């Protein structure tokens, strides 16, 4: 029962973590593009 709960939590957190990393990288890319660095 504990294994099922942990696997459910992990499967739920993985997409959220990937989405958060993607959004953060995208915002940093947009910010750098707006500042026109290099």
From Swiss-Prot:
It is a single-pass membrane protein. GO terms for cellular component: chloroplast thylakoid membrane; cytochrome b6f complex. GO terms for molecular function: electron transporter, transferring electrons within cytochrome b6/f complex of photosystem II activity. The keyword Chloroplast applies. Keywords: Chloroplast, Electron transport, Membrane, Photosynthesis, Plastid, Thylakoid, Transmembrane, Transmembrane helix, Transport. InterPro entries: Cyt_6/f_cplx_su5 (IPR003683), Cyt_6/f_cplx_su5_sf (IPR036099). The chain crosses the membrane at residues 5-25. It is found in: Plastid, Chloroplast thylakoid membrane. One of its GO terms (biological process) is cytochrome complex assembly. Its main location: plastid. It comes from the Eukaryota. Component of the cytochrome b6-f complex, which mediates electron transfer between photosystem II (PSII) and photosystem I (PSI), cyclic electron flow around PSI, and state transitions. PetG is required for either the stability or assembly of the cytochrome b6-f complex. The 4 large subunits of the cytochrome b6-f complex are cytochrome b6, subunit IV (17 kDa polypeptide, PetD), cytochrome f and the Rieske protein, while the 4 small subunits are PetG, PetL, PetM and PetN. The complex functions as a dimer. Belongs to the PetG family. This is Cytochrome b6-f complex subunit 5.
